Amino acid sequence: MELIRVLANLLILQLSYAQKSSELIIGGDECNIDEHRFLVALYKSGRFRCGGTLINQEWVLTAAHCDRRNMEIKLGMHSKNVPNEDEQRRVPKEKFFCDSNKNYTQWNKDIMLIRLNSPVNNSTHIAPLSLPSSPPIVGSVCRIMGWGTITSPNETYPDVPHCANINLFNYTVCHGAHAGLPATSRTLCAGVLEGGKDTCKGDSGGPLICNGQFQGIVSWGGHPCAQPREPGVYTKVFDHLDWIQNIIAGSTTATCPL
């Protein structure tokens, strides 16, 4: 994860919390190559930065704090070093944020919608993941995945994405666990209370899939990762459906939920 960059009056928190833009799955195993056709990798200057989710042939959803200039998006990737035959690469044509000022201290607005410079074609390793049709249910088992570090605080980055199952809690659990930062009703709280499984640095922007539905975007959490009673915080996709769908439809006045 990258250390949280906050305003001066929040600098004291930097040693305790971190964005997960460069995290990996802790406590997981290599994902099945067929289970993450929607998972994309965001690169900057040849360096892996974040994950993201393809939601149709032309749009990717990720975390706002993953934004970088001159970003490249790789689709259909499993191994970083051994390309799939159907891998495709794109760059952003447009980027959209809930907060036009890109104020990343507003953690409940950590969402970015990217329009690709050209549509992608479905293939063996590429296919979009649908937006959720119903809200998430506390108690659900959720799937996390990404190329983030698999160890913390020392970082070990894998060549292939790792996956793990975690549990969805009421957001108040994260509000209590991370009292210095606002886990709100616009966020989701997920992890394993005894620790040992978590998203981590490099996993930011990737999906949280609960009961088969795309419900969350990896946002931030404690450091080190996967500590007992410190679940991770995810942007709640369901609450942003109107904004997402209006942007895709071409609206210039779409607004995010308060």
Curated annotation (Swiss-Prot):
InterPro entries: Peptidase_S1_PA (IPR009003), Peptidase_S1_PA_chymotrypsin (IPR043504), Peptidase_S1A (IPR001314), Trypsin_dom (IPR001254), TRYPSIN_HIS (IPR018114), TRYPSIN_SER (IPR033116). Residues 19-24 form a propeptide. GO terms for molecular function: serine-type endopeptidase activity; toxin activity. It is found in: Secreted. PROSITE patterns: TRYPSIN_DOM, TRYPSIN_HIS, TRYPSIN_SER. The keyword Hydrolase applies. Glycans are attached at residues 103, 121-122, 154, 170. It is an enzyme of class 3 (hydrolase). Coiled coil: none annotated. Disulfide bonds join 31-163, 50-66, 98-256, 142-210, 174-189, 200-225. CDD domains: Tryp_SPc. GO terms for biological process: proteolysis. It holds the Pfam family Trypsin. Expressed by the venom gland. Residues 1-18 form the signal peptide. The active site is at 65 (charge relay system), 110 (charge relay system), 204 (charge relay system). Negative results: does not degrade the gamma-chain of fibrinogen, does not activate plasminogen and does not possess fibrinogen-clotting activity. Snake venom serine protease. Degrades concomitantly alpha- (FGA) and beta-chains of fibrinogen (FGB). This is Alpha- and beta-fibrinogenase stejnefibrase-1. It comes from Trimeresurus stejnegeri. The lineage of its organism: Eukaryota, Metazoa, Chordata, Craniata, Vertebrata.
